[in-house]
Design a protein with these regions (language model features):
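Structural motif
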Residues: 14-17, 91-92, 117-119, 148-149, ...
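Conserved beta-alpha junction segments in alpha/beta enzyme cores
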Residues: 78-82, 88-124
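ATP/nucleoside-binding phosphotransfer catalytic cores, i.e., glycine-rich phosphate-binding loops
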Residues: 149-226
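Solvent-exposed alpha-helices and their adjacent loops that cap or buttress functional pockets
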Residues: 9, 85-86, 93, 111-113, ...
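Short, acidic/small-residue loops that bind anionic groups at enzyme active sites
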Residues: 1-26, 178-182
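Conserved anion/nucleotide-ligand pocket segment
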Residues: 15-97
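Internal helical hairpin/lid segments
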Residues: 106-162
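Conserved active-site and cofactor/substrate-binding residues in soluble primary-metabolism enzymes
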Residues: 3, 31-35, 92-100, 126-133, ...
Length: 226
């Protein structure tokens, strides 16, 4: 999904919506499917006047139940977003699944990450060694020198390789002396429920207040391009 969405955005300049998948998200049991669908519908059909603050779901889950035998909703866990490094930023939202982005980074289908962008990244079913390598790729490509803030999504079934370290702790170590704001455990990823994010639109990030605010209407941008 990340590859298709970012390629479409790069070739057309139109905002794209990073969000739930048909089977894995909309096929989920209540209550998570209800919240995911509500946020998807809100983003595509209207959310009132801007600015729009993305809501924090009360609960989340990454419990695995085989679809062929699932007969109950997944176990909810108390939810919170985490301020890793305080600060405020405003810029174009860009990003997606980090492992997928690595596969076409630097090609004609990957949008250039510009000065001032807010980078959104998430991943799933990886271990500490793998994401350290992925974060290091971004650092070596000077991505962290260009972006004004980072939003890190929850990591489904993360394997810490016995280190006890969280993905955001590894990110902080890789980034080193960078002082840009970082908000972690954001709910637009492979866990449930899931927000829908308009890639290519301007947002503001306040890591200390744990808020992400949409400043630009994606539907108006699409309409104006016709």
């Amino acid at each position: 999904t990340t590859a298709l969405l970012l390629a479409i955005y790069e070739k057309t300049g139109l905002p794209v919506f990073y969000g739930p998948a048909l089977a894995s998200s909309f096929g989920e049991f209540p209550p998570f499917v209800d919240w995911t669908y509500e946020q998807f519908e809100t983003m595509l059909q209207g959310y009132g006047n801007l600015p729009y603050t993305f809501p924090v779901p009360q609960y989340w889950t990454d419990e695995f139940i085989d679809w062929s035998s699932q007969d109950r909703g997944k176990e909810p866990r108390k939810n919170q977003w985490i301020c890793v490094r305080p600060g405020r930023a405003k810029g174009r939202l860009i990003g997606g699944n980090l492992n997928t982005m690595e596969g076409f980074f630097g090609t004609d289908y990957m949008p250039e990450i510009r000065k001032g962008d807010i980078l959104f990244i998430e991943d799933s079913l990886k271990d500490a060694c793998t994401i350290e390598r992925s974060f290091s790729l971004l650092k070596l490509a000077s991505v962290f020198d260009r972006v004004s803030g980072v939003i890190l999504g929850k990591h489904e079934k993360f394997d810490d390789n016995g280190t006890g370290r969280k993905p955001y702790e590894i990110l902080l170590e890789v980034m080193g002396e960078s002082e840009i704001p970082i908000l972690a455990e954001f709910d637009c990823c492979h866990t449930h429920p899931m927000l829908t994010l308009p890639i290519g639109c301007e947002v503001s990030l306040d890591a200390e207040e744990k808020t992400v605010v949409l400043l630009e209407n994606p539907l108006e941008k699409i309409e104006c391009s016709r």
